[in-house]
UniProtKB/Swiss-Prot annotation:
This is Structure-specific endonuclease subunit MUS81. PANTHER family: CLASS II CROSSOVER JUNCTION ENDONUCLEASE MUS81, CROSSOVER JUNCTION ENDONUCLEASE MUS81. Residues 524-598 are annotated as: Helix-hairpin-helix (2HhH). The gene is mus81. Signal peptide: none annotated. It holds the Pfam family ERCC4. Catalytic subunit of two functionally distinct, structure-specific, heterodimeric DNA endonucleases MUS81-EME1 and MUS81-EME2 that are involved in the maintenance of genome stability. Both endonucleases have essentially the same substrate specificity though MUS81-EME2 is more active than its MUS81-EME1 counterpart. Both cleave 3'-flaps and nicked Holliday junctions, and exhibit limited endonuclease activity with 5' flaps and nicked double-stranded DNAs. MUS81-EME2 which is active during the replication of DNA is more specifically involved in replication fork processing. Its EC number is 3.1.22.-.
Amino acid sequence: MPTDQVCLGRKRPLPSCPNPLFLQWLTELRDSAKEKGLKTHFVYQKAINSLKKYPLPLKNGKEAKILQNFGDGICKILDERLQKHYRENGSDAAVHLASSKQMEESQKEPSGNFSEHTKLTQKEVRKEKGAKKKREYVPQKRSGGYAVLLTLYRHMQMPGSKGFMFRNELQTEAQPLCEKSFTVPDLGSKYTAWSSVSTLIQKELVVKTHNPARYSLTDQGLSLAEKLDSEETGTRHEDVDSQDGQNVVDLTLEEEDEDEEKESWSSERPAVALPVNQARGLMSESDPMGKSQTSETGRTAMGWHLSPGSYDIVLCVDLCETTGGSSVRKQELVKELQRNSVTFDVRKLNVGDFLWVARERVTPVPGQLRPPVGKELVLDYIIERKRMDDLCGSIIDGRFREQKFRLKRCGLRKPIYLVEECGSAAAHLSIPESTLQQAIVNTQVVDGFFVKRVQDAKESAAYLTIMTRYLQKLYQNCTLLCRSRELEGDGEAESEKMVANLSCSLMAFTEFNYGAIKNKCQTVREVFARQLMQISGVSGDKAAAVLKHYSTVSSLLQAYDKCSSETEKEKLLSSVKYGKLKRNLGPALSRTIYQLYCTRGPLS
């Protein structure tokens, strides 16, 4: 017998896919997207996995919509490919028989002499055996990457999961699983545990999409996260064999990544190691503390929650209310709050001047310089403070309308305007006092804000004190549930109903403050809205009504081009409905907007 002869054993034939053409086309689309560096290749891969599991033949792409991960786009592509296939091969061309022929050819076993294909395959096998095996990338236990993978995986397992998480939400949820801080770097360094997310994206374990960023697991990341989760909770989903006979996960990094990981993690701040008991209710065997620092903090299908008695209601004061301008006047407010024994915290607020948060109570850890960072949920009350001179200035420069619009869009259900009338000071301003009073009334009647009038900073402090006491009593027996900014409720009635039922859904402070950033990266639609609101007479409701019909400047200009006459162009937007009363935008504003975007010379 020749020395190079290979004995071939029996091979169990794999079941053939009944839709080989669809499988072939999806594979081509996936490979093409991967070559171009497009993230859509993950979508095609999911569709391929679903198609392989489906045992029945499909007549067209429309029928494939019943499968998981098949949307309108993929079904339309398959139908187009199928029509092209029929045009090239005739309407009677076989669609479901190719796989059976391929299976017959693949099942034919060579006898005696080996074909060229077999020899080439043997050479490739020897080459692969001789090559050094590349180690699989697995993040170190309780590192930033490890915590992010586990958090995304456990979030996907929850009922009603969106399948993705925002950055602030992900940092908050992943912190108990990580020994390093996701937000505070070590002294003298700029790196945090969040630095490892770029490595996860580079290794194609995590996908970052949209703006604000959404993070989700790829198929490869899902497989790795499932393995890490089974190791963490001590429940194996599959046996992992090793030479020592132990069921372990290989936590060895690739050689090219070892230096990168060491450089990143060596510069991070050591934080408290909290147990992993949120998603499964199980304690980690490797937990160095033995008990949870946040035992009253639980997890629900919507996210984590704060139980009654596990949090404090704290007033948050914007940094601008304590610094700059008239320091004597601003310090007077702080001193009054201290005199009234109000628990408050001065911080940067991206919208509003005062709000309240429910801050989790945490126990200091012996040996740690800083106590663990408690979770915070924002209550549905936010206050914008206005002195008469400030109100006058904001009306002149246009900030007044913009501030009201941003307060409506911030996600909190009960905005309040706190107006300091300051005696007769309004009589000496550049805008008549009657105009200022009318602006205040419009804020209450038209915009639906609650308006509180006071005389000076001392009365403002008294009102803040009363509100703090009221909210402490209102929420003292409530279970507070964390919700995403995108899952805003229906308004004030829902909030009161939930409080009456001793539960309330609130936003995390980090997510709220990040979503209210004024100068963050904006979409074309948002920039268009801001442009419209600079026009005299265009409110937020009117701008939103225009955006419903024309979301960008380009779409509006295209609509103007389709008009047959100048008069028709000027009246294009006049019949657009806005607001609750569904009033028309009117010919005057319609003509002004047309002149702004279509007049080449100076406006008349």
